[in-house]
Amino acid sequence: MTTPPLYILSDCHVGAAPAETTNALVHFLRRLRGESGALILNGDILDFWFEWRRSIPAFALPVLGALGELRASGMPVTWIAGNHDCWGGAVLRDTLGITYLTTPLRQTMGQWDVEIEHGDGLRGKADAGYLRIRPILRHPLSVWAFKLVHPDFGTRLALGTSEASRVHSAADNGLGLRDVALERIAQDGGPSLVVFGHSHVAGLTRAPNGGVYANPGGWGQVPRFLKLTADRIDLFEITSSGEDRRLDSVERKTDETLPHATERVGRIGRDEAVSETGYGT
């Protein structure tokens, strides 16, 4: 069991995102040093990641340095692979001491039963093409072959082809992943909280049975993060002045309060509302 608070963010796309959002990420990581709780990086933190024998992408160094400092301060860090940073290796695990996962994170966090997953490949027919190519991209033979490519050329090639993936992931304004999350929450014994990234659309959605779907949105567009405590989950945006501005908050429903869980049902538009104000674009 992980003890809250948990800080969750995703889709920073360092290497392709504006310098302002990458700098904000570095400052945020340094700000967490010495804090209690844990950090969850829910995929696509880097727009591309690969570990050659003696080389790694240079654009990642400021963020990796800040993560190393955060781990040295004692805060646990878990990195869940996305579709852009699925080739994690020894630098992340051994050098930095990060728990790097290529599978979803499922565990109890305080009073929450949580599932955290990046979200790529979950939308059925909408992701059919990606699902066909994903096993090839992640196959050990493909990884071995890519190590034969010069790091400069390999990095340039990967960054040059990544934009199409980012556009595709947000094509349905996050509704596909929202529906997947609500279906999981509705299952018998399902989680009380599902967190996805990938869509770049931020929002908190209450399920009819009281559970919650949360998405921090794309940090690479506007710095946002989720903060999970024992009683609630908050969605924050970091303003240009460096202050945390709460965009939304949902309390954890207990057995006593579940009869009132429908008070927020139907406010699916919160995802779209966040997008309409510019946070999810």
Predicted regions and their residues:
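Core catalytic region of metal-dependent phosphoesterases/phosphodiesterases
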Residues: 2-9, 14-109
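Conserved beta-sheet core of the metallophosphoesterase superfamily
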Residues: 95-103, 113-115, 120, 124-132, ...
